[in-house]
């Protein structure tokens, strides 16, 4: 599998509702941060606790990859739209956020190093 295929496979694993909670614990660098729509950061364990507690993830899928760029042999930036249907503290959400992610190759293994999620519904036509 090529590096690009490996990273896309990781993204699809992240989008699996059954694996989403533990995904970062299993696949992130030790200094990983997820920046929530509020702008507040959370680490891998914090994300796992949040998704396991307040969020009931019904559906998630990588809708479209807008940009995939090797910044070096060990760094990749990927910007994608995530279709996400979930309930947060009893409130249903059907979101289409844009997500920026940075992957880092550590000891020859690709790990997620950074992820930032936008709010609400992205206008996919603006990416064309």
Which role does the model predict for each range below?
Residues 6-17:
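Solvent-exposed, amphipathic alpha-helical segments
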Residues 68-76, 103-110:
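A short, structured loop/turn motif at beta-sheet edges
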Residues 79-86:
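Generic short beta-strand segments
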